[in-house]
Amino acid sequence: MAVYTEVSPAEAAPLLLSLGLGQLQDIAACSGGIENTNYFVNTDQGSYVLTLFERLTFEQLPFYLHLMKHLAQNGVPVPAPHAALTPGGGIVHMLKGKPASVVDRLQGRSELAPRSAHCAAVGDMLARMHLAGRDYPRQQANLRALPWWNETVPVVLPYLNPDQSRLMRSELAYQNHVAASSAYQALPRGPIHGDLFRDNVMFEGSGDSLRLTGFFDFYFAGWDSWLFDISVSLNDWCVDLSTGAEDSARAQAFLGAYQSVRPLIAQERSLLPAMLRAGALRFWLSRLWDLHLPREAELLQAHDPGHFERVLRQRASHPCGVPG
């Protein structure tokens, strides 16, 4: 959550009033993330997150915001966007010439050192999210899927050493081969989160009282295979951050909980190793892009691309499948 566009209290207050959210009390910039401008805002009625979208357009945003609304209405703990009090009640707003949204701030905290119980809770809720999205009527492609990889790899290759370049080229060729297979075409699809990392989930309590209070930051969502979404999550929740190696206990907890809600089909089970590599490639590539071709922003904290290079090498050399 970088800050590309500065918003003053005087600029934020009228928007909050127009949404019926009360009088602004304070506003504070969020420093995490890299895509959009985010502020925590408190009013006399509650706590919210104000987002100004720096890349997504007014035409693209309804997919994301209405998806959040749809999921919230179907029992998934997601912060629903607030609509204007005017006739029509739009949920995409304008602030400082940019599209904006306001959502409730979730209760709880992120768990940056998850245990198996956290991974099981995420796996369970991700499966419920996938099922809840089956009847979502809007479709929009995952904007960071294979077509984007094919476009972006040539842009980042000049910044890589020869060994990294060989890995990048060979993995991209492999993923294009996988995507052309009949097994890949048979994968179940629907809206995915696309970025369900440790810092995009909130929890309360511990032990037997542990409770997942919400998923957030859906702005990399899109229409894609559910297996890709699972793989992105496994590559963050269930790996050792220092080595990139899989933590088998956490992975089994995640997949077991997911499958208790939605069992994987045969093609998903066979392609999980390939999709784990795909998830690692996607974030290695996007982090290289953000590092070497940055945008100007206050509080910008670029993520280390080396982490997902390590994950990709681990996934390629030590394929991990579905337990049982």
Name each model feature, range by range.
Residues M1-L85, G205-S209, P319-G324:
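Conserved NTP-binding catalytic cores of kinases and kinase-like/nucleotidyltransferase enzymes
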Residues V7-S18, P137-Q139, T152-G194, R198, ...:
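An alpha-helical support segment within catalytic cores of ATP-dependent transferases
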Residues S31-D44, V49-L50, P81-A84, H177-F228:
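Active-site acidic catalytic loop and adjacent metal/ATP-binding pocket
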Residues T43-P137:
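ATP-binding pocket architecture of kinase catalytic cores
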Residues L112-R166, L187-R189, L299-A302:
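A cross-family kinase active-site recognition segment
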Residues P154-V155, F283-G324:
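ATP/Mg2+ or Mg2+-diphosphate-binding catalytic cores
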Residues L227-P263, A278-P294:
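Active-site activation/catalytic loop segments of kinase-like enzymes and analogous catalytic loops
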